[in-house]
Amino acid sequence: MEKDNQPSIEELKAFLQKNNIEYKNIDLFIEATTHKTYSKVNKNSKDYERLEFLGDSLVGFLISDYCVREFSSLEPGELSRLRSKLVDKLALFKIAQKLKVEQIIKTGPKKARNEVLSSSNVLSDVVEALIAAIYLDQGMQSAKDFIKSHFYEIANKAQNKPNKDPKSELQEYFQTISAETVKYETIEIPNKRSFESKAWHLNKIYGTGVGLSKKDAEKNAAANALSKLKT
């Protein structure tokens, strides 16, 4: 790390080499791993948001291409469901964890750095920005190779595994970033003969839901939380 605890160019190059990512223009990859909290105080630097914009579209296209080529037996509806599992933020976050992208992200000062690096959305966005950098620097085939290399395992698990209960999926998501369990605050609404539930994690409400039973209300609250986390 540099003196201000920012990753150095040498560390970025080592990260790329470790993950078999070739490069011609290292500046593209510096941009792909720079958060806006860093660029705000370092005026000559660019943040990853433009590359993330491109990467978001690339991921959608490349995942669709990958699914059609690799899963020839699936019907269009099945392909659509598989693609949706691969292009959401949770799948990208898993890739970010696998690559350990938090080690090469430039951010603002210490407080901002801690907040940024604990954000699953930021880590997911950096993966998309990296895919865009690979595409611009090395071309479409290299971007396809990256997708195939890092999404293959997730794709096979998603295809072969039935959809999880939303409460289980939400708990699994938070287990990747905290030991704290998800809690549900559920009340009965007498006049409507229904229940309303709120999904809490670390003193923050992530989702709400209503159901004819306590179980259904909590399930819907978890589903609501997941839909927000995936966008």
UniProtKB/Swiss-Prot annotation:
Reactions listed under catalytic activity: Endonucleolytic cleavage to 5'-phosphomonoester
Keywords noted in UniProt: Cytoplasm, Endonuclease, Hydrolase, Magnesium, Metal-binding, mRNA processing, Nuclease, RNA-binding, rRNA processing, rRNA-binding, tRNA processing
Catalytic residues (positions): 56, 128
Gene Ontology MF term list: double-stranded RNA binding; metal ion binding; ribonuclease III activity; rRNA binding
Keyword Ligase tagged: no
GO cellular component: cytoplasm
EC identifiers of the protein: 3.1.26.3
Compartments where found: Cytoplasm
Cofactor(s) listed: Mg(2+)
Domain RNase III: 12-139
Binding site for Mg(2+): 52, 125, 128
CDD domains in UniProt: DSRM_RNAse_III_family, RIBOc
GO biological process assignments: mRNA processing; regulation of gene expression; rRNA processing; tRNA processing
Record domain DRBM: where: 165-231
Job of this protein: Digests double-stranded RNA. Involved in the processing of primary rRNA transcript to yield the immediate precursors to the large and small rRNAs (23S and 16S). Processes some mRNAs, and tRNAs when they are encoded in the rRNA operon. Processes pre-crRNA and tracrRNA of type II CRISPR loci if present in the organism.
NCBIfam families to which the protein is assigned, alphabetical: RNaseIII
Family statement: Belongs to the ribonuclease III family.
Quaternary state and interactors: Homodimer.
Name this protein carries in UniProt: Ribonuclease 3
Organism: Mycoplasmopsis synoviae (strain 53)
Gene, per the UniProt record: rnc
